[in-house]
Amino acid sequence: MRIVVLAGGIGGARFLRGLKDALHHRAEQGESPSSITVIGNTGDDITLFGLRVCPDLDTVMYTLGGGINEEQGWGRADETFTVREELIAYGMHPQWFGLGDRDIATHIVRSQMLAAGYPLSAITEALCDRWKPGVRLLPMTDDQVETHVVVADEKGRRAIHFQEWWVRYRAQIPAESFVSVGADSAKPAPGVLSAIDEADFVLFPPSNPVVSIGSILGIPGIRDAVAAKTVVGVSPIIGGAPVRGMADACLRTIGVETSARAVAEHYGADLLDGWLVDEADADTVVAGVEVRAMPLYMSDPERTAAIAGAAVDLALELKERS
C-alpha cells in the first residue's frame, strides 16, 4: 500500500508512529510492505534569532526518529537550554519561545542550507538522513507560508504570528480570523501532488483541522488532489473537547462547533469518505461520510496502533466500494 498522511505536530506524529507499528504488524502477518508519505504543515514556521524553525516538521522527524521529548510531545529528549538562558541575559526577545540547545542545531543547519539556496523539501530530506523516520517527509510547500492571527485587545486590532498567539498567549486572546500569509501564491513542494496521485488512500490524523490540516489543504492544488482519493480522518474532538491542545479556540474563530460531527462537516463530504470518532461520539452522523466509532485516546503505543490500523481498514473498505 502507498499511504499519504497530512500531518501537523504532536497528534500527527503520534498517529504516524502508531501507523508505522500497525503496518509493521501487517507485514509480519505476510502482507506486502507499505510506504508512507507525510505531507507536513509549515504554516506554523517562524524565524527566531535569524533561524528558520519548522515546529511540525521537526516534531514528526524527532518522534519517528526516536529523539522526541516524550513527556512534552515536542522538542528534543535530554534537552538543555544554555543558549536560551544566555539570550535572556542579553535581553534578547522573544523570550516566550524556548529553543533548546540540541534543537537549535537543527535550525542552524536548516537556515544555512536555506541561505545557500536549497529548497525546504531538499533540506528536510537531508535532515531526515540523520533521523531515519521510516517515512518520506515532505513540507506542504517550499514557499514561505505563515499563519497569522488577527486579534483585538488593549493594544488594538493587529495581526500576530500564530506561534505568539498559541505559545505566548495560549490562545486566550480572542481571535477574529486566521490569515495564511503567502498561501495564495504558494505551490505544492516537489513530490507532493505525485505522492497523492499515486496513493491508495489519504489519512487525516487527529491534527488541528484549522491551522494544521487546514493549512496544508489551503495550498493551491492540494485539496483538489486529495479530494480525488479515498480519504479517512480521525476526529481530534472527543465528547465536545479537543483531544489535546486548543483546537476549540481555532474552531470557534472560524465559526465551527467543537464536535466530531462539525469537524467532519467542515472538511466536507466532497473531501472526506470515512470518519473515525470516539465511542463518546458514537451517535455522530455526517451526510455522505461513513462514520465508525472506537476508543480514540492515543494513550499507549498499542492503542495508537489500533486506531491507525482501524483507519487503514476503513480506507481499504471504502476504496473497495468506490
UniProtKB/Swiss-Prot annotation:
GO MF annotation, one: LPPG:FO 2-phospho-L-lactate transferase activity
Highest taxon, organism lineage: Bacteria
EC numbers on record: 2.7.8.28
Residues noted as binding 7,8-didemethyl-8-hydroxy-5-deazariboflavin in the record, renumbered to the chain: 58
Pathway as given in its UniProt record: Cofactor biosynthesis; coenzyme F420 biosynthesis
Transmembrane segments: none
Keyword Transferase belongs to the record: yes
Reaction(s) this enzyme catalyzes, per UniProt: enolpyruvoyl-2-diphospho-5'-guanosine + 7,8-didemethyl-8-hydroxy-5-deazariboflavin = dehydro coenzyme F420-0 + GMP + H(+)
Cofactor: Mg(2+)
SUPFAM superfamilies, A to Z: CofD-like (SSF142338)
Keyword terms: Magnesium, Transferase
Family membership: Belongs to the CofD family.
Task of the protein: Catalyzes the transfer of the phosphoenolpyruvate moiety from enoylpyruvoyl-2-diphospho-5'-guanosine (EPPG) to 7,8-didemethyl-8-hydroxy-5-deazariboflavin (FO) with the formation of dehydro coenzyme F420-0 and GMP.
Subunit structure: Homodimer.
Protein name, UniProt field: Phosphoenolpyruvate transferase
Organism of derivation: Thermobifida fusca (strain YX)
